Amino acid sequence: MVFNRSQPRRALTASASAETREQQSMTPDRMGSVRGLTRRSFHRIAFTDWGSPTAERAVICVHGLTRNGRDFDYLASALAGRGRRVVCPDLPGRGQSERLFDSSDYALPQYCSDMTALIAALGSVEIDWVGTSLGGLIGMVLAALPGSPVRRIVINDIGPYLPWAGLLRLGANLKEAPKDFETIRAAELYLRRVLAPFGELEDEYWRHLAVHSVEWKPERQCYESLCDPCIAHAFRNPWHYSVDL
């Protein structure tokens, strides 16, 4: 497991701007990675790490299908302030994690394998799990297995029954997702549209999501999405049935 320790948080003066305070409070205490394994090769799974590394039990927060671990920055910062260790991974092909060689590996068994590698690297006997959509699905699978280290689980935007209409909509959105954007603002406007179910969020949060959803590519003079379009492989065929777990 690899750790890169960020700069320690500095005390802010009374005159510090709200933007500066926001940026500092949303800086992870550590950033690290573990190695996952597919049938063909190893790959790097990146994560942010908040709070005390010696906390008795870690909280693992796992994002939805096209998102990344920085979605949980606000929650992670708040929980770390209460003495918890919070780890937020990027699933393969998202955020700072490596993309997979074979697009067919973007599937639930691989995600569960990668998260098991992360749990083992953390060394926590017990963990709490917070999962959104796909992250919740992974959590349910891991929590249901004998000997699971998952002791408590909080899930949203997912359940044991997945209606086919929702799967169709998700697949359509994924296939139509832009690969790059001219500006951060363009990325933000796109996210505001496709993530409208997130609810009424403040402007600073939408901006935060956008900043961590793209990466500037100087050779192409554009912002590239930090989501591998090949994850759409699972939706290559139309869904004509609901999924009952």
Can you say where each PLM-predicted feature lies in the sequence?
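Alpha/beta-hydrolase fold catalytic core
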Residues: M1-V59, G81-R84
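Structural cue for short, hydrophobic secondary-structure segments
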Residues: C61-G64, C88
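Active-site glycine-rich loops that stabilize anionic/oxyanionic intermediates
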Residues: G64-R67, S133
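Alpha/beta-hydrolase active-site loop signature
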Residues: T66, L91-G95, P160
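Active-site loop/oxyanion-hole signature of alpha/beta-hydrolase fold enzymes
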Residues: Y74-A76, G81, V87-V130
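Conserved hydrolase catalytic core segment
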Residues: V125-G166
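A catalytic-pocket lid/entrance helix-loop region that shapes and gates access to the active site
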Residues: I158-A186
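Conserved serine/cysteine hydrolase catalytic core
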Residues: E215-L245
